From Swiss-Prot:
Pfam families per the UniProt record, alphabetical: Ribosomal_S8 (PF00410)
HAMAP family assigned: Ribosomal_uS8_B (MF_01302_B)
Protein's name in the database: Small ribosomal subunit protein uS8
Single Gene Ontology BP annotation: translation
Species, as recorded: Citrifermentans bemidjiense (strain ATCC BAA-1014 / DSM 16622 / JCM 12645 / Bem)
Family, as annotated: Belongs to the universal ribosomal protein uS8 family.
GO cellular component term of the entry, any: ribosome
Amino acid sequence: MCMTDPVADMLTRIRNAGMAKHQKVDIPSSNLKVSLATVLRAEGFIKNFKVIADNKQGILRVYLKFIDEKEPVINEIKRISKPGGRVYVNSDKIKQVKNGLGVAILSTSKGLVTDKTAREMGIGGEVLCTVW
């Protein structure tokens, strides 16, 4: 079966695993997903991740983070730019997520960065998702 939006699949797997209180979730790996996991780890939304090599494309294992081992750190993770409707913003049009409590992850010419980093660097890009 062909997957039309692998990023949305990754975000959905992370959201569902958090609600089910799983400690880890396995996702088919790609360079974009590894970059996305790197940003999520740097912002403190996940504990860690690792890429497990297999004979195919590899598996990205994401270790989730919880507050007091009960509530997931990620309250909401939402896909913004979709294959049927891309959302691009300039550096001066990037909005804060939940008044700065959350982050928007952008795909820019400098790679995947958060909304704050994109504003500081003065670059815009495609808004992949928001997390808070």
